[in-house]
Amino acid sequence: MKKSLIALTLAALPVAAMADVTLYGTIKAGVETSRSVAHNGAQAASVETGTGIVDLGSKIGFKGQEDLGNGLKAIWQVEQKASIAGTDSGWGNRQSFIGLKGGFGKLRVGRLNSVLKDTGDINPWDSKSDYLGVNKIAEPEARLISVRYDSPEFAGLSGSVQYALNDNAGRHNSESYHAGFNYKNGGFFVQYGGAYKRHHQVQENVNIEKYQIHRLVSGYDNDALYASVAVQQQDAKLVEENYSHNSQTEVAATLAYRFGNVTPRVSYAHGFKGSFDATNYNNDYDQVVVGAEYDFSKRTSALVSAGWLQEGKGESKFVSTAGGVGLRHKF
């Protein structure tokens, strides 16, 4: 009898130790096709087409917490890409951290979403192709090796500050500072995310200083309807051009509505003429993405989307079209 009790207790120990650990993830893949045409005068200078089986951002993660008493908890997470196309490797290459949570809010250190990235619901698309999501306005979003503080919510308002150290920014790049806030009232919401970096090497022989970005998102989100608009401004001084001041403004909007198991969705983005890292590159664009999701269950959905992107106008425009179908399962 004693031996049976001892064996039962030993068998239960791993279960108890894992009680606050959660395994989660998403597996999603599909087929995408695209066609891009670069124009030179009245003729197409180049045409590129492609069709392939792609991973749409699969991930797997482990997270947990421990109650330390007096309302304080230790929290942790390790999350990684898990491409079923076999193109990703390594641990912790997505959001991974350790920290503390309590009445004061949440303090974490590790590879963390930037405050700007947490305003990224304006681009809800599951895609590999840049033409099947509003990815140009979303390009500055990142995960940073950093320390981040998130405040508790007061009357629907919460805030975040984040600091990425100089030695973690990579060669030729400085530390960066990030801040933002969220406000929710019923289904209505307002979000702001911004960042500042003293200097940054965009590429070889392209260096910028006093880079800053600001994004404001506002909209409505409930169980059936999601609608949002965003405006984003990037701004910097280009070192190689006598510290000339350069900027670009972008706007985007997304609308989705759930009808039973089907959720149709449409997004539009526009980039005004200008570029924060060049003086002679207009970088204006228009982009439209339409699509829908069909939920087989709470965890499994079918995806379909089509996209169009035009960069520039007139004789030197670049036009791309794309389409995709996929399947997503959450666990």
UniProtKB/Swiss-Prot annotation:
Principal location: membrane
Which gene carries the instructions for this protein?
porB
Query: Please, which domain of life does this record's source organism belong to?
Result: Bacteria
The record, for Gene3D superfamilies, names: Porin (2.40.160.10)
* GO molecular function term, any single one: porin activity
**Residues passing through the membrane, by range:** none
Checking InterPro entries in the record gives:
Gram-neg_bact_OMP, Gram_neg_porin_domain, Porin_dom_sf, Porin_Gram-ve, Porin_Gram-ve_CS, Porin_Neis
What UniProt keywords apply to this chain's record, in alphabetical order? Cell outer membrane, Ion transport, Membrane, Porin, Signal, Transmembrane, Transmembrane beta strand, Transport
This chain's function reads: Serves as a slightly cation selective porin.
Entry keyword Transmembrane: yes
**Sequence similarity:** Belongs to the Gram-negative porin family.
Kindly indicate where the leader peptide sits in this chain.
1-19
Q: GO CC annotation: what is one?
A: cell outer membrane
Topology in membrane = Multi-pass membrane protein
Q: What protein does this entry describe? A: Major outer membrane protein P.IB
A matching Pfam family: Porin_1
How is the subunit organization of this protein annotated in UniProt? Homotrimer.
